A protein has these predicted regions:
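Conserved beta-loop-beta connector loops within the AMP-binding
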Residues: 1-31, 66-67, 129-133
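A structural signal for short hydrophobic beta-strand segments in well-ordered beta-sheet cores
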Residues: 6, 60-64, 107
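Short loop/turn microsegments at loop-to-beta-strand junctions
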Residues: 3-4, 53, 58-59, 103, ...
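Active-site lining segments that contact anionic ligands and/or coordinate catalytic metals
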Residues: 3, 27, 67, 102, ...
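Conserved C-terminal "lid"/linker of ANL adenylate-forming enzymes
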Residues: 80, 106-112, 120-124, 137-241
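Hydrophobic face of alpha-helices
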Residues: 27, 31, 73, 89, ...
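Short acidic amphipathic segments
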Residues: 96-105
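Conserved ATP-binding/catalytic segment of the ANL
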Residues: 20-90, 97-98, 114-115, 147, ...
Length: 241
């Protein structure tokens, strides 16, 4: 379209850096500018994440080749941010799909107290495969040039949640990864046999984890639970029932 500017910028902490334009072929966050671009949303609260220095941030990851062709490679919301490293989940998924024992896979970020997020992957093995997830992880390690991108864990699944268009439903996998991280934190805090309920609620761009404990949970245990989940740096609330 005439008068359209398209550029790919670097990311830092999941946010666009319009002062750092990516080199040809380098993957970054795609942004567009032009007279046909909307000046903003009716709800101004959405503008902060969608506009930067006059650019409309598409939310897509992409690259521009030396001839000016634009290629989309993924979604920015799927980027895994591990201790300041921006990890494209596609890098992990491609390494896994090259293995003959993998039929389908998806990589997501799992909350982590130290790194903020760690890369993990859910894997559906090929029919008849008996490989363990530990052996599978060891066999794909050499595929990664960036050590931070090596998944910390692989979770085996029999099937994936899918969208109506046949795509893997990654938000559901991120919730499962977060739930697993929370439960691992609480295993040493909450008495064995305690009934725990975990759910998620979406509000705008933010997803909140809701944790419900029994009404008779001791105050000191509640305090430790809040401290443990806070360390994962995810929005949450705790209630009793």
């Amino acid at each position: 379209m005439p008068f359209t500017q398209v550029s790919v910028f670097a990311m830092s902490g999941g946010k666009i850096q319009t002062s750092v334009e990516c080199a040809p072929g380098e993957v970054g966050l795609l942004a567009v500018k032009g007279p046909h671009i909307t000046p903003g949303y009716v709800d101004p609260s959405h503008n902060a994440q969608s506009f930067a220095d006059g650019w409309f941030v598409t939310g897509d990851l992409g690259r521009i080749d030396p001839d000016g062709r634009t290629y989309l490679t993924g979604r920015a919301k799927d980027v895994i941010i591990r201790g300041g490293h921006n990890i494209d989940p596609l890098m992990i998924e491609q390494a896994l799909l090259q293995h003959p024992d993998v039929q389908l896979c998806a990589a997501v970020g799992q909350p982590d107290s130290y790194s903020g997020e760690i890369p993990v992957a859910f894997v559906q093995l090929a029919p008849g495969s008996t490989i363990s997830v530990d052996n599978l992880l060891n066999e794909i390690r050499s595929s990664f040039q960036e050590p931070a991108a090596i998944p910390k864990r692989l979770y085996r699944v029999d099937s994936f949640p899918m969208t109506s268009t046949g795509k893997i439903l990654k938000p559901a996998l991120r919730q499962k990864a977060a739930e697993t991280a929370v439960m691992e934190k609480l295993n040493s805090i909450v008495p064995s046999g305690t009934s725990l309920e975990i759910s998620f609620q979406q509000s705008g761009h933010q997803e909140t984890l809701h944790l419900r404990l029994p009404a008779n949970t001791a105050p000191d245990v509640l305090g430790k639970v809040r401290e443990a989940v806070t360390s994962l740096r995810i929005p949450f609330n705790v209630s009793q029932a």
